[in-house]
Each structure stands twice: as structure tokens, then as C-alpha cells.
């Protein structure tokens, strides 16, 4: 298994699919990485040479991925909460942030129903 950005990449999958195992790299970004490095997207990781894997590592390093990306997202949410803006309050209360209705639905975000006390 090749190791890129601290993640073990599966050997038996195509390069584009394998790169998506890295947090922060989706299909489009993976295709862009393959195009920039000149690596065949349909080639399997086990068939790539060490030089090609090094090229992939260098290209992935240009993007914010894994722990840095998670930290960045959490810091942005924390900033909204500290500002006390509407979006921050919604995050703090665990409610939908982007204007969805909450009278019905929104169960995933709100969690399980709380029993009505009498």
C-alpha cells in the first residue's frame, strides 16, 4: 500500500479512486492531480513507479488535506460561534444552518425526539 498525505492508499484500485481515500480530495481534485502529474487515471496504484507516486505526493501536498483541513473547518465554525452570528447560534444549538425548515424534518441535525414532559 502506498502512503500519501498520511493515508494508506489501496493498491488494487484505479489512481483516481485511490486518491479519494484522502480527506479533502474528491473525484474532481483527483482527476486534476492525475492530469497535472501526467499519471494515467485508469492505472492501478500497484502498477505505478516510485517516481510517479512521489509526483502524486508532491501534488497532493499543494492542497489542504486531512488534519489541516479538519482543523481549518472546525476553526471556521468556532469563529462563527464566537461572533454570535445567526449561523454560529445555529451551530451551537445543533440546528440546520442553511435555512431549512425545522417544524418538521431536520431529525438528523436535531437528534432523537425528546419525550414531552407532563
UniProtKB/Swiss-Prot annotation:
Chain positions covered by the region annotation Disordered: 93-118
Annotated coiled-coil segments of the chain: none
Superkingdom of origin organism: Bacteria
Assigned keywords, A-Z: Ribonucleoprotein, Ribosomal protein, RNA-binding, rRNA-binding, tRNA-binding
A GO MF term: tRNA binding
Signal sequence residues: none
GO cellular component terms attached to this protein's record: cytosol; small ribosomal subunit
Record keyword Nucleus present: no
InterPro entries in the record: Rbsml_uS13_C, Ribosomal_uS13, Ribosomal_uS13-like_H2TH, Ribosomal_uS13_bac-type, Ribosomal_uS13_CS
A single GO BP: translation
PANTHER family the UniProt entry points to: 30S RIBOSOMAL PROTEIN S13/40S RIBOSOMAL PROTEIN S18, SMALL RIBOSOMAL SUBUNIT PROTEIN US13M
Functional summary from the UniProt entry: Located at the top of the head of the 30S subunit, it contacts several helices of the 16S rRNA. In the 70S ribosome it contacts the 23S rRNA (bridge B1a) and protein L5 of the 50S subunit (bridge B1b), connecting the 2 subunits; these bridges are implicated in subunit movement. Contacts the tRNAs in the A and P-sites.
Record-stated family: Belongs to the universal ribosomal protein uS13 family.
Protein name (record): Small ribosomal subunit protein uS13
Organism: Pseudomonas fluorescens (strain SBW25)
Amino acid at each position: 500500500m502506498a502512503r500519501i498525505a498520511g493515508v494508506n492508499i489501496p493498491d488494487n484500485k484505479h489512481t483516481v479512486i485511490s486518491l479519494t481515500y484522502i480527506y479533502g480530495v474528491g473525484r474532481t481534485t483527483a482527476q486534476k492531480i492525475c492530469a497535472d502529474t501526467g499519471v494515467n487515471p485508469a492505472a492501478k496504484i500497484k502498477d505505478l513507479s516510485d517516481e510517479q507516486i512521489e509526483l502524486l505526493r508532491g501534488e497532493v501536498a499543494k492542497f489542504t488535506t486531512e488534519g489541516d483541513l479538519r482543523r481549518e473547518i472546525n476553526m471556521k465554525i468556532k469563529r462563527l460561534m464566537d461572533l454570535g452570528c445567526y449561523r454560529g447560534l445555529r451551530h451551537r444549538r445543533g440546528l440546520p444552518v442553511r435555512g431549512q425548515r425545522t417544524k418538521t424534518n431536520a431529525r438528523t441535525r436535531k437528534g432523537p425526539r425528546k419525550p414531552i414532559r407532563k
